[in-house]
């Protein structure tokens, strides 16, 4: 048996800078990961199959177009018994499906002893799959295929992730964008020696999908506000196309206290403290 961890992907920034003739949007995003996520296990079997377990399993029925199965098919026609242990909310803006696909590729490449597919094949699975396969902090551009490592390591930081229990499909959010030619991030991203300096830079940047997502799901604004109100929260913003929002914290204790407080105030929300992985 082989196993791979599918970390949550967090867009600290997400600038929509254009749209190609084929309809794909051009992005400029600072992407990190959180030390919370799903797990994909792969065991030898004659046929390819998928079982979904975990606290979020009921929200993701097994279907032939599941990204885990699609990822498996890109590696060939061999068999395997796959188990997806689902902890991340579905359609939540933190790359759950893409991270699961990337984890499936890693687990199956080990099981079958084959190389990972080429970048073009990975990108066909979804715009976030290449960055999830990379699994470290990068600047993501193009339609998701241009990944540039950061010039300096990110500071130690903690995140609180909160989702109000609302699934937000990505296409309607992009369709509701007011404009698609927004300015990118600065050409040069300096190093950030402290979490405070990182938060200061992030405060000057954006998630261009946040306004249209809030228009479609007003609960996102309340989620962001709940995070921003917590002691020690340096910045609160939506990740991806929503509905998950993140709060940036310098200290583990403050992050854990914030997660507990929000979970108590909003028992129907999904809330998780996590170390930021860069």
Curated annotation (Swiss-Prot):
Please list the residues that bind ATP.
89-99
Q: Which residues pair up as cystines?
A: none
Q: Which gene encodes it?
A: ispE
Q: Name the active site residues.
A: 9, 128
Specify whether ATP-binding is a keyword of the entry: yes
What NCBIfam families does the entry give?
ispE, PRK14608.1
Q: What is its EC number?
A: 2.7.1.148
Q: Which reaction does it catalyse?
A: 4-CDP-2-C-methyl-D-erythritol + ATP = 4-CDP-2-C-methyl-D-erythritol 2-phosphate + ADP + H(+)
Protein name from the UniProt record: 4-diphosphocytidyl-2-C-methyl-D-erythritol kinase
> What pathway or pathways are given for this protein in its record?
Isoprenoid biosynthesis; isopentenyl diphosphate biosynthesis via DXP pathway; isopentenyl diphosphate from 1-deoxy-D-xylulose 5-phosphate: step 3/6
Could you say which protein family the record assigns here?
Belongs to the GHMP kinase family. IspE subfamily.
Q: Name one Pfam family in it.
A: GHMP_kinases_N
Q: Which SUPFAM superfamilies match?
A: GHMP Kinase, C-terminal domain, Ribosomal protein S5 domain 2-like
Give one GO term, molecular function aspect: 4-(cytidine 5'-diphospho)-2-C-methyl-D-erythritol kinase activity
Gene3D superfamilies found in the cross-reference section: 3.30.230.10, GHMP kinase, C-terminal domain
Q: Which organism is it from?
A: Cereibacter sphaeroides (strain KD131 / KCTC 12085) (Rhodobacter sphaeroides)
